[in-house]
Regions:
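Active-site beta->alpha N-cap acidic-glycine motif
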Residues: 2-78, 132
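Short, electropositive alpha-helical surface patch
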Residues: 142-156
């Protein structure tokens, strides 16, 4: 495969869409934002060059006023609530998750939902019109009991990762391609490996 070429699976999928007369909607999601950084500046520049919409998942407990000021007026950028503090509350030996109850520590679903509601209100206050009703669970995971009741927090949609959608009352709009190689240096993946 030539350098810079997309994977055969991705190209085949795009061909199927074209044959069916479908048009892919492309948008980006970036997680873990709390303040303006050089990396975020590069991402903002890229979204402007390519006119690509961006859903920026902001951690409410650590979000800064400086971030809100930097993003103000950028109409292709919308803000999602990204948990509360991005702290792992999963039981020992389980995959990381903030949006989970943990009976061993006394953390209930009500506790989790309270944090999410507080974070959602804080994001709305800080980012005003750019704020969305989206909730992006840290590590793209949440307990089923939390997902079932998420609408009680003011959140109106969920964005996770992958093609699967959990059975919940709220709609999901997931990302489907991860551009970052998290296990090998946390850098961008080569185009030919995206599928």
């Amino acid at each position: 495969m030539p350098d810079g070429a997309a994977s055969p699976d991705l190209m085949a999928e795009w061909a199927r869409w074209q044959d069916a007369g479908l048009k892919a909607r492309f948008w980006l999601r970036d997680d873990d934002a709390v303040t303006a950084t050089p990396s975020l500046e590069r991402l903002i520049a890229m979204t402007q060059v390519f006119d690509a919409p961006l859903l920026l998942a902001v951690i409410p407990a650590h979000a800064t006023h400086a971030l809100a000021v930097r993003l103000r007026g950028l109409d292709r950028i919308r803000i999602a609530t990204h948990g509360w503090s991005h702290r792992n509350h999963a039981a020992a030996g389980m995959k990381q998750s903030e949006a989970t109850d943990n009976l061993a520590t006394g953390r209930s679903s009500d506790d989790v939902l309270h944090e999410i509601a507080t974070g959602h209100r804080q994001i709305g206050t800080l980012f005003a019109a750019q704020s969305t009703g989206f909730f992006v669970p840290p590590w793209n995971r949440m307990a089923p009991a939390v997902a079932e009741r998420l609408g009680e927090t003011g959140v109106s949609a969920i964005s996770g990762f992958g093609w699967r959608r959990a059975e919940t009352p709220l709609p999901w709009l997931n990302t489907h391609i991860d551009l970052i190689d998290w296990r090998n240096g946390r850098s961008g993946k080569p185009l030919q490996t995206l599928d």
